[in-house]
Amino acid sequence: MAFTGKFEMESEKNYDEFMKLLGLPSDVVEKSRNIKIVTEIKQDGQDFTWSHHYSGGQIMTNKFTIGKESEIQTFGGKKFKAVVNMEGGKVVANFPNYQHTSEIKGDKLVEVSSIGGVTYERVSKRLA
């Protein structure tokens, strides 16, 4: 499957600006800056299980089916209902305050989120 795999974060751009625009408190932004994130994706046709494993043991998992409404949890911990779509090989979700896209480029998982003119990009390398 195109997205199935385990990916370790290797770089990010515009972290501080994006998290502040999301409304996260500065102490949370500071504390989260150097957290190691491993993303594990399991894709079975249109069904996805998308987990972020954070250093310290916290895990955030979202399960969704492309084109169907699902409950999704955001970076900030908020939960809401959304339809996740596949557009041109990218997984696309419109969160309440921002749009998020994910795609596989070679052995990299590239995640891009945009809010108020700021674009946050996280690139993770494939581990498995």
Curated annotation (Swiss-Prot):
GO terms for molecular function: lipid binding. Keywords: Acetylation, Cytoplasm, Lipid-binding, Membrane, Transport. The keyword Disulfide bond does not apply. Expressed in ileum. It is a peripheral membrane protein. The modification N-acetylalanine is found at residue 2. SUPFAM superfamilies: Lipocalins. It is found in: Cytoplasm; Membrane. PROSITE patterns: FABP (PS00214). Its main location: cytoplasm. It holds the Pfam family Lipocalin_7. GO terms for cellular component: cytoplasm; membrane. Belongs to the calycin superfamily. Fatty-acid binding protein (FABP) family. Forms a beta-barrel structure that accommodates hydrophobic ligands in its interior. Can bind at least two ligands per molecule, however, the stoichiometry is debated. Binds to bile acids and is involved in enterohepatic bile acid metabolism. Required for efficient apical to basolateral transport of conjugated bile acids in ileal enterocytes. Stimulates gastric acid and pepsinogen secretion. This is Gastrotropin.
